[in-house]
UniProtKB/Swiss-Prot annotation:
Phosphorylation by MARK1, MARK2 and PKA regulates its ability to bind microtubules. Phosphorylation at Ser-265 and Ser-297 seems to occur only in neonatal brain, the levels falling precipitously by postnatal day 21. Ubiquitinated by MDM2, leading to its degradation by the proteasome. Ubiquitinated by MDM2 and subsequent degradation leads to reduce the dendritic spine density of olfactory bulb granule cells. The modification Phosphoserine is found at residues 28, 47, 74, 90, 110, 115, 265, 287, 294, 297, 306, 332, 339, 342, 354, 360. Residues 356-365 have a biased composition (Acidic residues). The gene is Dcx. GO terms for cellular component: axon; cytoplasm; dendrite; GABA-ergic synapse; glutamatergic synapse; growth cone; microtubule; neuron projection. This is Neuronal migration protein doublecortin. Its main location: cytoplasm. It is found in: Cytoplasm; Cell projection, Neuron projection. Interacts with tubulin. Interacts with USP9X. Microtubule-associated protein required for initial steps of neuronal dispersion and cortex lamination during cerebral cortex development. May act by competing with the putative neuronal protein kinase DCLK1 in binding to a target protein. May in that way participate in a signaling pathway that is crucial for neuronal interaction before and during migration, possibly as part of a calcium ion-dependent signal transduction pathway. May participate along with PAFAH1B1/LIS-1 in a distinct overlapping signaling pathway that promotes neuronal migration.
Length: 365
């Protein structure tokens, strides 16, 4: 006996066709609008969690610190304690953060931050070692356009204007620079060391560079030259001050400079260095005295002149006038005025006469 199951096959076929049409024509639950919205919201939340927040941190009580920008994210810092530890390595010093970063405050100190979720994009915060906020104007030393919310066009224009201003300033600075020989006197107990420094467009590029050259030349006992003063007591603050009417400057180190009248007054030796021949007084060595030069020079000078001329010349202060008119006098072929020995003697003789014997020259004329 055979059973006929044809009607069951037709019913199963119909049900299979209905399921197939439902799968092909109608969207599955995973592709529904609700699931698509849920998946998009989850991705946005995940991206917001992964996105780093750029914030700036300051030291508590440090008004000269410009702050440090951090990119805070959950991938970089697994916990708030990890952020505190990293800030300790970056900001810890021996003055303001002795015990590291233990607390984070808002920039006005009104609220204490307890987790990374409380940090907001583009805001500034203060790191502290103790539970005490020091109210200081932290943001006064920072460019207000540092925030990431500022448009890129503004950021691109700022460096261009800064570069153009710097180039214009550099061109302006080069206009007043001219060859000039200045005298630098070391501050302190007299006798003081004095050196001469040549300033021109090749040696005077900036005020800091000139201070470095003066430091190497003057060699202060306290180290680096920090301040320069004119003889009137005015402090030199820029490169332009070197090319004014003043030629003499007092170099001071890190020590506190005392404004005493004796510090700005020059003694006889320092005046001799100033009024002497620049080529002969380029270093700290003192010029020879008139007595020593007059004692060494009369011998060869008398042999080069006739007795009648030598008797008429020795009339003023025991100094022979032949020393002043040597190029005009008739010399023997042995000692010519163009020989190196005679030029060296003339340089030594002319230097003190321009300082001490000005009266005698006026009488002899």
């Amino acid at each position: 006996m055979e059973l006929d199951f044809g009607h069951f096959d037709e019913r199963d076929k119909a049900s299979r066709n209905m399921r197939g049409s439902r799968m092909n024509g109608l969207p599955s639950p995973t592709h529904s609008a609700h699931c698509s919205f849920y998946r998009t919201r989850t991705l946005q939340a995940l991206s917001n969690e992964k996105k780093a927040k750029k914030v700036r941190f300051y030291r508590n009580g440090d008004r000269y610190f410009k702050g440090i920008v951090y990119a805070v994210s959950s991938d970089r810092f697994r916990s708030f304690d990890a952020l505190l530890a990293d800030l300790t390595r970056s900001l810890s010093d021996n003055i303001n953060l002795l015990q590291g970063v233990r607390y984070i405050y808002t920039i006005d100190g009104s609220r204490k931050i307890g987790s990374m979720d409380e940090l907001e994009e583009g805001e500034s915060y203060v790191c502290s070692s103790d539970n005490f906020f020091k109210k200081v104007e932290y943001t006064k030393n920072v460019n207000p356009n540092w925030s990431v919310n500022v448009k890129t066009s503004a950021n691109m224009k700022a460096p261009q204007s800064l570069a153009s201003s710097n180039s214009a300033q550099a061109r302006e600075n080069k206009d007043f620079v001219r060859p000039k020989l200045v005298t630098i006197i070391r501050s302190g107990v007299k006798p003081r060391k004095a050196v001469r420094v040549l300033l021109n467009k090749k040696t005077a590029h900036s005020f800091e560079q000139v201070l470095t050259d003066i430091t190497e030349a003057i060699k202060l006992e306290t180290g680096v030259v920090k301040k320069l003063y004119t003889l009137d007591g005015k402090q030199v603050t820029c490169l332009h001050d070197f090319f004014g009417d003043d030629d003499v400057f007092i170099a001071c180190g890190p020590e506190k400079f005392r404004y005493a009248q004796d510090d700005f007054s020059l003694d006889e030796n320092e005046c001799r260095v100033m009024k002497g021949n620049p080529s002969a007084t380029a270093g700290p060595k003192a010029s020879p005295t008139p007595q020593k030069t007059s004692a060494k020079s009369p011998g060869p000078m008398r042999r080069s002149k006739s007795p009648a001329d030598s008797g008429n010349d020795q009339d003023a202060n025991g100094t022979s006038s032949s020393q002043l008119s040597t190029p005009k006098s008739k010399q023997s072929p042995i000692s010519t005025p163009t020989s190196p020995g005679s030029l060296r003697k003339h340089k030594d003789l002319y230097l003190p006469l321009s300082l001490d014997d000005s009266d005698s020259l006026g009488d002899s004329m």
